Amino acid sequence: IDMDKYTLDAVLRKGAELVKRKGIKCLVIDPFNKVRDINGNESGDVNVYTLEYLSKIEIFAKKYDVLVIVVAHPTKMYKGTDGKIEEPTMYNIKGGGEWYDASYHGLLVHRDYEAQTVKAKVLKVKFQNLGENGAEAHFSWERRSGSFVPLADINNDDPMPWEDV
């Protein structure tokens, strides 16, 4: 494996090329810890490194008008007193304070292995007209179709949180 292809600068260069050649509107970096910023943070401070990393992504996103999604897994999560794995926050990602402060949005995807469900939860929305902090949706995995299915039926007549009632 040529690890030089997996640096942040190389991924952003390829992203810029794809914007120009294919007109992409979304770039996904998955997982964050495998796409290293080898030119950043000489001090070794993880918070400075994370801030520089996210700043490069923000500059790229604004320059090319592209949505950039960064998949960042939390550090090891432990079971709570109820025996379930605790729900992570943005602070559970290495460099966590910077993840919360520097990002525009934060979305949690968390599995409940016992109940065999998945929760999608909004952890941060910078602009309130784009969503609601703390909003949740719950899903189950449907093996036959290979997709997530909402646990509760959605009523299309219900107003969205940002719509005036």
Residue spans of the language-model regions?
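C-terminal regions of RecA-like/P-loop NTPase motor modules
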Residues: 5-27, 41, 55-64, 76-165
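Non-membrane alpha-helical structural segments and their capping/turn regions in soluble enzymes
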Residues: 8, 47-51
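Walker B catalytic acidic pair
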Residues: 30-31
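Signature of the SF2 helicase/ATPase Hel1-core->accessory helical subdomain module
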Residues: 34, 75-76
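Conserved ATPase-coupling elements of RecA-like P-loop NTPase cores
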Residues: 36-45
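A generic secondary-structure micro-motif detector
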Residues: 46-47, 86
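Conserved H-loop
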Residues: 66, 70-73
